């Protein structure tokens, strides 16, 4: 939250020069894991997963590689601290899920809860749909940074939120491309009731959003953004960008909601 607030304040400075927000979370998590559970690879991984499953109120499941726990009739996968959850991971989970059905503790599972620190692009839309087509209900759930804080863990102040779903309309006229947010759906199971009651329109969930109009599978470049401030609560929901050259581009939209979670969506664009 502090980093997000600092970014908005920097953007509010007139004639501010370009800057980069470096995400060092992976290294921080690696240090935390070593401090909490030690350096011996396999025991550390088991202890880490057990810790996460306990926070998630899930039971440990033995005998599987990609499925680590069971909660309320659903399997649970715990992502590692240093790698995002990607499509191939989900493919392995589904294959193991099918082999596990009808065996022991996994006899009545309904789907898979995938806990992760980071997720590859379009997991909530594309990969979730692919899993559904394969007959498996998959939920992607972000591991909150608060698990790194002993005080928050001891007080039980840990909330796991499912990834939101972002709907975007992209329209092109020659070299002008308009990107418009059309919906933002936040799963409400674990959202505080006072927050839910305060939201009157889907856009109320959004605090900040930005666009990289030419994403090249590397770093997200903040080429345009709209965000709320204390004085100005208005949020622009569409923008038009003019490309200098025709070609195939990937537009990436990043949204940060009022809960502090980020959602990213990639859209292919053909400019004539």
What are these regions (language model features)?
Residues 1-272:
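S-adenosyl-L-methionine-dependent nucleic acid methyltransferase catalytic domains
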